Structures are given as C-alpha cells and as structure tokens.
C-alpha cells in the first residue's frame, strides 16, 4: 500500500515543468553546478578515510520538456508513464534530472542508487507533496492523514496507526475477519461462474477482486460489512465505490490543468465531489462505531466494553480522536484496495499461463491445508512458493510504479552531493525489471525467491531491486495485513480450482491508470478440482 495516485500523477510532471523552458536560470540556481573536488565522501561503500573526486551535477543528463510533452500527448504515453522509465533509462542511464518549474527532481533508475538514498533517510522521511489531497482537506477543515502530513506530526500519527497493524502477530488477529469475507467471495465467485455460458468463467476478475478488497479493508478498518459481495449491493455502497473512481479519474485533470480552469471546467468539482462522498461514507461508519461504543458503555460500564477491532481500539484507547480518525482512515482505505486487487489479478493471470507453476503451488497448498479446510495465518510459514508467487507478481507489477523522497539533509549519491530538500524520484518499474538486479527480468519466475531453488533458477542480485512496500520508517503501514489477505485468498482459490485463462482474454499489457492495471478485462475459468 505504499504511495498512491497523486504520486504517479505528479511523476508525469516531474519529467517536465509547466513552462517550455527546459531548465532556466532559476532551475539551475536550485543546486550548485560544481562541487568541491577534494572533500571526503560518505557514500555507502566508501571505506573510512576514502577520498575521491566529487562529481559535478552538470554531468547528470537533463530531460527536455518538449520531448516529454511530445511523448505524453502525441505519442500516447499518458497511460504508459511506466514505459517512459524504460525509454529514459535507455537514453540517459540510471540517473537523470527533470524540472517542475524551478524545482529540480533527480530520477533514479537502478537498485544501488535507490539503496543509497533510502539508507540515508532521516527520522521523518518526506514524500512528494500531496497537494491535491491537502487542498481538499483544507477546504473542508479535515485533519491530515498518514499520506498528507509530514514531520513530527506524521511520526506521532504513524506511531498511533502502527498499533494493531504493523507486526505479523498483530496482523494475524484479522485472520478470522478475512476468512469471513473470503467465504462470501467464494460464494459470489461460484454465482458468477454458474451465470456464465460455460458454467465456470468470470469475465472481469479485476472488478471482482476490487470489490473483495474494498469489502475486506472496510471490515478491518471500520469493523463494518458494506455489502460489496452481495448479489444486490446497497445503494450507499454503490455511491461510495463510484466516488472512489470519480476522485481518481479526475485527479489526472486536476493535476495537469492550471488552477484558473477550475471554475470553468468540470474536473475540479468532480474531484472534490469524489472526496466528499468518500469522507461522508467514512464519517457514517465512524459515527456508527461511536454509537456502538456508547451503547456498550451504557449497558455494561467501562469494564464491560469489549474492544472488537482496529477502529474501536484507536478510539477507545485514545490513540486517535474521532476527528483524527476521520482524517486518517479514508487515506488508509485508498491505499488498501489497489494493492490486493491488482496483485491478485496479475498473479492469477500468470498462474493461468503457467500450469506447471500452478500445479506446484496447488501441491504445496493442499500439502499444508487439505481440501475442505480453511487456511490460517500459521500455515503460510510452510508455503514458501505461495509467498514467492506474490513477491514475483509485485516485482513485475509494483502497484505504484514510482515513489519519491525529499531529503532532509545534504546527502551524497553516486559521487554527487545533493543539498537538503532535493526531491528524488524512485523509478520502481524499470528497477524491478533491470537485468543487473534480476536475471531473466521479464519472465515470471517465482522460484527465484526460494532459498533452496535449483542452481539454474534465475536469481535475485540486489535486495533493493524490488521494494513494493517501501523501506524504513515510512514503509507501508498495511504491509502485513495486505500480505495476509492475499495469502489467504490465493490459497483458497488454488486449493479448490484449476485456473485457466479465458480464450478471449489473450495477452495482457499493463496500463498506468494511477496504479498498474491490465489494459483490458481479465477473464478466467475456474475448474473445480476433484478432492
């Protein structure tokens, strides 16, 4: 769940400023062009006392803005921004500069460079400015959440939200809740199979996984089932689902278009309307939980209250006020849906194309959890291949193909000295497909993640080649529950069905619609296995 839509959208602008001057005098003034040549370096890998020539920033290639806009709007890369990473790395190498107005951005496209920056992060790592999200919060007097706040306040908020989520043992507490939602998912899957012409096909798995992920994360965060997996979805839930799409779809226009267009064109209003509906739905769920807690207090007194879940814990323990919860939980919700739904879609797509890996996974799953039994969190310690399938999927399709950091102090990277407030852009998509980090990088090879794999198996050659959940204190807050959620559902599916790609689906390509999604509907056939 690391990073969100605005990060991807703003990366599009990092390739170029809003003006047509590629890097004018103001941009050059942001960072000194030449650096002292005799200062000792503190770069990772440099031994004590090692001195080497520091490099001039003039050596770093610059991305021309006209080229970027031509590729974006004329050549059609607006939905292929991740592929621009591939083109730019081939042209400029693993590091290049681009500008957003006077602000310089340093794009990094190799695992060693990412590692150097990540290992020098401060106590309060700073993401790119979530300006559009903050504008909505400010207009409606809402508190900032974990993705919109920074500094010490972010640290305090993160410490509160970490509880009941961050540790594996804490995430395991949600196993029963996830399995309850998975039971309903399996029922809905069978209903859709039965309704298909073949009796075994689901025509749009990405949508079904999206509804599953939304149902699951709402149940975890708000302790409320919202009916996404029912035959007839409640009207307020339908409105909520549409509002998420409305917000994300109009984020692109809200990012690219100048502010003077907001009263004239409809996109900004639609963007705000989407957020308003999201927060309205969240407020309703929080208010219902507060009423439930008050009813318990009246009925049983303070000692009789049973803390039932995440939101209840945060409110009852005083970790968050209701107003703070209102600012934070919708942001966690936004991060929690796409990771699960997209990763599971891509995982089943690749498993359907590789029956040998799918059969090996089936044997592993039923060897630990026989048919008819429900997997539990402890079972996954004995399912290394299942974990490897998810890791390999996230390597090929990092949910958000870019991320960023604004450094809090002067740091050295690859011999270049960058001052405080430099913004680095992490090009995760091209890094995770780099042959120097992963052998046979374009192939789906889950066995590369297994310690006891055969010598001929493709290997992992750099630990920072794939970091889909981030690194350090700002790593993904919900990583453990996202992993558990995906493991539980994937195990159930492979335990019960053989998954086959529907003939009409064909080859898929990834499209950058905020996150990396398939370019068309993913139809899959689920053939029930014989016990």
Swiss-Prot record:
What's the effect of swapping residue 240 to A?
Impairs sterol 26-hydroxylase activity
Q: Quote the annotated effect of residue 271 to A.
A: Reduces sterol 26-hydroxylase activity
Which residues are recorded as modified (N6-acetyllysine)? 283, 509, 520
Q: Which GO molecular function annotation, any one, does this entry have?
A: heme binding
Tissue specificity, per the record, is:
Expressed in the neural retina and underlying retinal pigment epithelium (at protein level). Expressed in the gray and white matter of cerebellum (at protein level).
Give me the reactions it catalyses. Answer: 5beta-cholestane-3alpha,7alpha,12alpha-triol + 6 reduced [adrenodoxin] + 3 O2 + 5 H(+) = (25R)-3alpha,7alpha,12alpha-trihydroxy-5beta-cholestan-26-oate + 6 oxidized [adrenodoxin] + 4 H2O; cholestanol + 2 reduced [adrenodoxin] + O2 + 2 H(+) = (25R)-26-hydroxycholestanol + 2 oxidized [adrenodoxin] + H2O; (25R)-3beta-hydroxycholest-5-en-7-one-26-al + 2 reduced [adrenodoxin] + O2 + H(+) = (25R)-3beta-hydroxycholest-5-en-7-one-26-oate + 2 oxidized [adrenodoxin] + H2O; (25R)-3beta,26-dihydroxycholest-5-en-7-one + 2 reduced [adrenodoxin] + O2 + 2 H(+) = (25R)-3beta-hydroxycholest-5-en-7-one-26-al + 2 oxidized [adrenodoxin] + 2 H2O
Principal place of residence: mitochondrion
Give, as in the UniProt entry, the pathway in which the protein acts: Hormone biosynthesis; cholecalciferol biosynthesis; Steroid metabolism; cholesterol degradation; Lipid metabolism; bile acid biosynthesis
Name the protein family.
Answer: Belongs to the cytochrome P450 family.
From the Swiss-Prot or TrEMBL record, give the protein name: Sterol 26-hydroxylase, mitochondrial
Species source reads Homo sapiens (Human)
